[in-house]
Amino acid sequence: MSSRTSDSVTSHDRLANAIRFLAIDAVEAANSGHPGLPMGAADIATVLFTKVLKYDPSRPFWPDRDRFVLSAGHGSMLLYSVLHLAGYEKVTIDEIKRFRQLGSLTPGHPENFVTEGIETTTGPLGQGIATAVGMAMAERLLAARFGSDVVDHYTYALASDGDLMEGISQEAADLAGHLKLSKLIVMWDDNKISIDGPTSISGSTNQLARFAASGWATAAVDGHDPEAILAALEAAKASDRPTLIACRTTIGFGSPKKAGSEKVHGSPLGAEEIVATRAALGWEAPAFVVPEDALNGWRAAGAAGRAAREAWEARFAARPAEERAEFERRVAGTLPAALEGAIVAVKEKAVKDGGAVATRKSSEMVLDFITPAVPEMVGGSADLTGSNNTKAKGAKSVTPDDFSGSFIHYGVREHGMAAAMNGMALHKGLIPFSGGFMVFSDYCRPAIRLAALMGERVIHVLTHDSIGLGEDGPTHQPVEHLAALRAIPNLLVMRPCDTVETAECWQIALQSTDRPSALILSRQNLPLLRTDATAVNRSAEGAYEILAASGPAQASLFATGSEVSLAVEAAKLLEAQGVPTRVVSISSFELFLERPAAERAKVIGDAPAKVAVEAAIRMGWDAIVGSNAAFVGMTSFGASAPAKELYAHFGITAQQVAARALDQLRQA
């Protein structure tokens, strides 16, 4: 492995050392952070950003730029240093000095919604690799639609040993290898150090063999040899497969006492060691000062991308006006005008057809109407296509050799699927959605949480949403999952009660450009309760009266999804006993709680008896109906039996709801 001292400094070294010392100084000033990776991977980043990557700091969101994902998000100062050095205007030296401080553009881990030039938020290891897979998929999908003269770029990721230890890396590697994502290149910072010590204490996997077995091209280079790094990257660009490049590096490169040790991973070097490191690498500039030669070299590299961007703009301008407008619309994320008509049409069909339909089937019906109207939608499923009903009529499957389709077979890779959808949404130009069993949303949770944090439009169709799925039993019956999903900030959770509400919830999900959505759908058939087929979206209110009382309400029943029809039955029982009863359908806690307090109070009403019913745990309901309301639902795991027997066994019946309301009236 190369070893460079102050006596053998090259121009490359000066550029790489600028990264190292900005990272060292920022971590020291913050008294917090991870200097080891930026010091060790500086040579990789320098080659990539000065010799290979296609980008223009003056246009951070240029659609045909190459994407770079720092999967090892703890090494954020590597990326912040590069952005500052390359000329991203907002990442000033003052922001570098404010590393990890409240309100800075340089938070502890990269956040794409905070800092221009950051393609995705990373930090939870493994997420970045799988997100990069989604970005590479988006590039192929859009190129198939608009041509390679408009869409032709690479996705690069820098991953750590920890990234490759995470299970999601295998899901991502399998999917990328199968789809032959040749424009995906992952650089592995192979420093053989983990927080606890050498990686050998916890693993001995041959990572290159693992990725090769998944269909990847692989290479191993000295991560401190710029010529070897460049050659490997050029070979990767020419490959017909995704590529993993193992870059053997020394963590904390240049530190006389801490290089190669876990001690440099997540702690400041300390003043004495910084002085020694400056001497070892021949860096005489004081803290946060980049010598003119190094800064000029970096700024020239950043400015070099302008020509590629302008050439792309010229090619794009030569395309027909209608095609340009469609591409720009999709990248901007605006919806076509045809969506509203499609939603009304599916409502009209539902009302005309009537009958009981599982909301998973309702969702399929909606997709048949809206996917032709919104061609940027790209669906998929985790090997449950026929159960989730996420493949619209006429949808063509994506294959390794043909990305003109709009449906992706993700296989049993829920976590990788969710993260890949994040990457597709971040890329822009597509609206990803996919299906899975609701109970397995636990497998998706880290990626769903990141989508919510980033505010990305990603749609999760989660079916088989309760004990109503029946015989498969408690391993597959969600009980706590609604509460768990509702606990994620900025995630829109919607549980429609029939086909009309399902159509409305799909419309809301598509219109929610700044947050992900989860559509919670039933396996069992549900009666049509809504008979209006207008453009008015009642579900957007979050909660509304779906059945009025015969007089001043003495009881108010609140329900979601499959339990709304049960509440309607209970209301009829109560009305038969002379108790005027109303029913409120709550399509979404989040939408309801966003309404003004006075509006919420009006919907909840002042009936002396209030009962909420949902085939799930109570957690979260008190914020809607108050702690004094009765609740009919689950307090344990489910069981294996037909759905109707399970509802009776667990006491989730119209009779029980009515009884609880009468109990409350007697106590009033």
UniProtKB/Swiss-Prot annotation:
One of its GO terms (molecular function) is metal ion binding. It comes from the Bacteria. Pathway: Carbohydrate biosynthesis; Calvin cycle. Its EC number is 2.2.1.1. Substrate binds at residues 34, 265, 360, 387, 464, 472, 523. Its cofactor is Mg(2+); thiamine diphosphate. GO terms for cellular component: cytosol. The record marks 34, 265 as: Important for catalytic activity. Thiamine diphosphate binds at residues 74, 123-125, 162, 191, 265, 440. Keywords: Calcium, Calvin cycle, Magnesium, Metal-binding, Thiamine pyrophosphate, Transferase. Mg(2+) binds at residues 161, 191, 193. One of its GO terms (biological process) is reductive pentose-phosphate cycle. It catalyses: D-sedoheptulose 7-phosphate + D-glyceraldehyde 3-phosphate = aldehydo-D-ribose 5-phosphate + D-xylulose 5-phosphate. Binds 1 thiamine pyrophosphate per subunit. Gene3D superfamilies: 3.40.50.920, 3.40.50.970. The active site is at 414 (proton donor). Catalyzes the transfer of a two-carbon ketol group from a ketose donor to an aldose acceptor, via a covalent intermediate with the cofactor thiamine pyrophosphate. PANTHER family: TRANSKETOLASE (PTHR43522), TRANSKETOLASE 1-RELATED (PTHR43522:SF2). Homodimer. Belongs to the transketolase family. This is Transketolase 1. It comes from Xanthobacter flavus.
